[in-house]
Amino acid sequence: MSKAIIAKKEKLVDDFAAELKEAKAILVIDYLGLTVEEVTNLRKDLRDANVKMKVIKNTYLKRAAEKAGIEGLEDTFVGPTAVVYTADAEDITEPARIVSKYEDDIDALSIKGGMLEGKVASQEEIKKLAAIPGREGLLSMLVSVLQAPVRNFAYAVKAVADSKDE
């Protein structure tokens, strides 16, 4: 193999290691059996959420993970593997939510494992995380809970005012 090809592969591994090092959430998925249309739709939804998906050879992935200091995911780097990751600390649940939605709809897609904020997460933990509403949903729930007493008081005052009018 020529030195130029080796240098190109080393650069690919180094670049991917840098991206993995910055990632707050990493999911390793098996995409075998997905149609081109399904992969395209998945990538589009991930891109819209500021999440990246990369299909990379397992040997390169192992080297990149090693360089990034990621341990505990090596057993997931088997067979057809894609890595879904985000460096966005705003909502680390978003990749899990999107991939889990596709996993429910498409039998061919499966989550192998992942890492969330530096901690290895099993397939079950990722599915539980995906069930939690996103930041927007949680904020709207909080606002609703905070508004409830004020709203109930306003209804009570209105009911008293209506009863006095009659």
UniProtKB/Swiss-Prot annotation:
Record keywords: Ribonucleoprotein, Ribosomal protein, RNA-binding, rRNA-binding
This protein's name: Large ribosomal subunit protein uL10
Keyword RNA-binding attributed: yes
Top-level taxon in the UniProt lineage: Bacteria
Name of the encoding gene: rplJ
Species whose genome carries this gene: Lactobacillus johnsonii (strain CNCM I-12250 / La1 / NCC 533)
Organismal lineage: Bacteria, Bacillati, Bacillota, Bacilli, Lactobacillales
UniProt-listed PANTHER family: 39S RIBOSOMAL PROTEIN L10, MITOCHONDRIAL
Molecular function (Gene Ontology), one example: structural constituent of ribosome
Pfam families the record matches: Ribosomal_L10
Record's function text: Forms part of the ribosomal stalk, playing a central role in the interaction of the ribosome with GTP-bound translation factors.
One of the GO BP terms on file: translation
Matches recorded under SUPFAM superfamilies: Ribosomal protein L10-like
Similarity comment text for this entry: Belongs to the universal ribosomal protein uL10 family.
GO CC term (a single one): large ribosomal subunit
Quaternary structure and partners: Part of the ribosomal stalk of the 50S ribosomal subunit. The N-terminus interacts with L11 and the large rRNA to form the base of the stalk. The C-terminus forms an elongated spine to which L12 dimers bind in a sequential fashion forming a multimeric L10(L12)X complex.
